[in-house]
């Protein structure tokens, strides 16, 4: 059974691998470590059978939350792990009185956009040609509770 726990430094190789498999411009191990050590960031891993199948990075600044990264291993997609990670960060946000959460997503990432919409997020802006490799627009999505 899958469970979620706080990320620890020993998870860096697995999370770096998830980054490389999930993003065209992955974060380096150093960037991930910086986030892990930041007092503004919360990071969790989703573990299935002692294997890290997903992770997310949630940042809180001035009372607002931002989903910085979320990734699920390619072979573990379609099992609801992204939803479980989102539910976990939403509960954490509520526990810390964070009502509004934002994120950015590639305009072509239909699976992620569908997940975010199912969690109450709406597209509020578009950043034209924001992403590289390939060049693509970003949707800025918000879930506002305030």
Each language-model region and where it sits:
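Short glycine/proline-centered loop/turn elements that form peptide/ligand docking sites
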Residues: 86, 109-112, 129-134
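Divalent-cation-assisted or electrostatically stabilized phosphate/pyrophosphate-binding catalytic cores
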Residues: 141
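Acetyl-CoA-dependent GNAT
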Residues: 2-75, 79, 83-88, 92, ...
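Conserved hydrophobic beta-strand within the GNAT/NAT acetyltransferase core sheet
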Residues: 67, 101-105
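Conserved catalytic-core motifs of GNAT/GCN5-like acyltransferases
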Residues: 104, 117, 122-138
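Short amphipathic helical patch at the helix-1/turn junction of helix-turn-helix
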Residues: 72, 106-107
């Amino acid at each position: 059974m899958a469970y979620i726990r706080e990320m620890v430094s020993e998870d860096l190789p697995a999370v770096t691998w998830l980054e490389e498999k999930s993003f065209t411009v992955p974060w380096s191990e150093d960037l991930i470590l910086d986030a892990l050590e930041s007092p503004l960031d919360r990071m969790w891993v989703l573990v299935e059978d002692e294997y890290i199948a997903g992770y997310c990075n949630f940042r809180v600044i001035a009372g607002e939350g931002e989903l910085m990264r979320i990734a699920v291993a390619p072979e573990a997609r379609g099992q609801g792990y992204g939803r479980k990670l989102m539910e976990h960060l939403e509960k954490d946000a509520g526990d810390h009185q964070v009502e509004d959460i934002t994120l950015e997503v590639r305009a072509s990432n239909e699976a992620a956009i569908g997940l975010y919409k199912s969690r109450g997020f709406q597209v509020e802006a578009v950043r034209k040609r924001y992403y590289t490799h390939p060049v693509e627009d970003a949707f800025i999505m918000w879930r506002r509770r305030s």
